[in-house]
Amino acid sequence: MSKVYDWFEERLEIQAIADDVTTKYVPPHVNIFYCLGGVTLVCFIIQFATGFAMTFYYRPTVTEAFNSIQYIMTEVNFGWLIRSIHRWSASMMVLMMILHVFRVYLTGGFKKPRELTWITGVVLAVITVTFGVTGYSLPWDQVGYWAVKIVSGVPEAIPVVGSSIVELLRGGTSVGQSTLTRFYSLHTFVLPWLIAVFMLLHFLMIRKQGISGPL
């Protein structure tokens, strides 16, 4: 076993990487509130795992979406638990994200030279809320349908381009199958890639600049 490790160590310098990851300086003023970003990440990982599990059974059509959710809840082994964890961790992720933003703002973590870290964090917050909006519609029940109708109709108040934005979101002039398809694609493909990219940028900046000092 040691020979295998030595072979990889010689080529990849695994120990040096491990030392760099585990020996970063942590300022003495850091407390439990500085863990809120990490808790948000844990919630996202739970979201990813449980959401991926549900894609095996969910059907993104207006005629089958609600019934497929009922099937997950009543027929799939531990389906009720997986979906419940997905919903609970979604609420927890939004809450932890909000608290994290407030903590960073109140402790001045957005100031020079960490402006870009703050900007990527704000983008991540917007993506998180968008996850919630798109996911809320997927059961395609009365609550989900009317939520989509209201949210997708908001841009109509924008002069000139408002109607075009609404049609782009809905896939037409009214809420229907095209709308559900768009929201499902956003929720399961577009947003996960976006949040992964901005998370990577966010974490790399934090690793490079370290944790901000006290006010």
UniProtKB/Swiss-Prot annotation:
GO biological process: photosynthesis; respiratory electron transport chain
Keyword flag Membrane: yes
Annotated TM spans: 32-52, 90-110, 116-136, 186-206
GO cellular component, one term: plasma membrane-derived thylakoid membrane
Entry membrane topology: Multi-pass membrane protein
Cofactor: binding comment: Binds 2 heme b groups non-covalently with two histidine residues as axial ligands. Binds one heme group covalently by a single cysteine link with no axial amino acid ligand. This heme was named heme ci.
Residues binding heme c: C35
Keywords per UniProt: Electron transport, Heme, Iron, Membrane, Metal-binding, Photosynthesis, Thylakoid, Transmembrane, Transmembrane helix, Transport
Subcellular location: Cellular thylakoid membrane
Cofactor(s) for this UniProt protein: heme b; heme c
Molecular-function GO term, any one: oxidoreductase activity
Binding site for heme b 2: H86, H187
Subunit structure: The 4 large subunits of the cytochrome b6-f complex are cytochrome b6, subunit IV (17 kDa polypeptide, PetD), cytochrome f and the Rieske protein, while the 4 small subunits are PetG, PetL, PetM and PetN. The complex functions as a dimer.
Misc. remarks from the entry: Heme 1 (or BH or b566) is high-potential and absorbs at about 566 nm, and heme 2 (or BL or b562) is low-potential and absorbs at about 562 nm.
Family the UniProt entry places it in: Belongs to the cytochrome b family. PetB subfamily.
Protein name in UniProt: Cytochrome b6
Source organism per UniProt: Acaryochloris marina (strain MBIC 11017)
